[in-house]
Amino acid sequence: LFLQSIYYGLKLDSVCRKIKSRHKFEYDLNAILSDLIYTRVLEPSSKSSSFRAAKQFLEPPTYELHDVYRALSVLASEMDFIQSEVYKNSFFLGDRMDRILYYDCTNYYFEIEQEDGDKKYGKSKEHRPNPIIQMGLFTDGDGIPLAFSLFPGNQNEQKSLKPLETKILQQFGCDKFIYCSDAGLASEDNRVLNYMGQRAFIVTQSIKKLPAEDRAWALKKTGFKRLSDDKPVDLTKLTDDDKNQLYYKDEPLTTKKLDQKLIITYSPKYAAYQKAIRAEQISRAEKMVANGSLKKQRKNPNDPARFVNKVAVTNEGEKAKIHYYLDTDKIAEEEMYDGLYAVCTDLLDDDVADILKVSEGRWQIEDCFRTMKTDFEARPVYLNREDRIKAHFLTCFLALLHFRLLNRSLKGTYTTEQLLHTLKDIKFTDIEEQGFMPVYER
């Protein structure tokens, strides 16, 4: 019922009528789409299982399962239209913070063993060997979904931004915003794209990938100020009271195409956290050295094996013996970056605290992906046809939009888990001659 109020608030029934006027079909697209969205939130499963689950709703389906699969093809063909319409209609439910747009990418795996269409072998976020498809997602400043796109699993995700952003500019009427992303989607081309018109950018920056001169400046513990009052500080003389503060310094970072500001922040609390994590990893690396064993494959950059090196020692005429040792140079190099974080922006005159606050909001889009993958079970994907796969992700996107808008209407007082649990507990029973009666606690 609560999801239904969001559905009709977004005027998706009207959107379905507009779509019907362009296609020849007899089934009730509005009923199918709404049921797909509700079941994705309440009982995420396959399309056939969702159809069975929908039969338990107050208004059970009057359509058949084969109608659902036919509707998926229609929904896929209208994917861009539906996204732009729900964005415009979402203003009927409240203002959108569309002056800040967060962008990120993730991928979803398929239960197949061969590449097919856009389902390509690529770098899976979950380290799975299956073919994947990638998704680019924009959210507004409140973490409410705005638009998404799909692209092949083997494509560089940096190139996914321009087509989707162009769609937003042309179809959504949204052309004045600050683009915000992590360093992985902050190539110079993507920054230049948001250096034009009424757009700007705030992106994280890898300190290790800075030009040598700028990297050396960033690593120096001099020139920092306390963020709260701009008071200059000596990072080597911080007291215990100072360790909960955040410190920063900034400088121009100019390229042939861009005038930017580079902001370096230092957090003593984050530095202590990184040091503690690394101490555990060093302990595990020391055990590897003692045991004389080292994994050949390193799956991630935080693997303790990165601190283990090897050298071959030979005696004349004898086969080389491999000796493992702890790489103290590698450890010392990593320690230099403890507590440091970098952000780049073309908002040269804006307050540093405001810029950092926008950048910190990126957690919301990461939470969107977690909700889609874990709570809405958007993966693995079992569909084969490209159009039906598009429709699957469209319904996942719309389900996420409904869920976020509902949570906002509740002033964000519930966690994802709490709100889902509450929605799933809302049940009714059909009492003879009395109609439906609620059987849940408010």
Model feature map: region roles:
Residues L1, L10-R442:
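Anion-binding and metal-coordination hotspots
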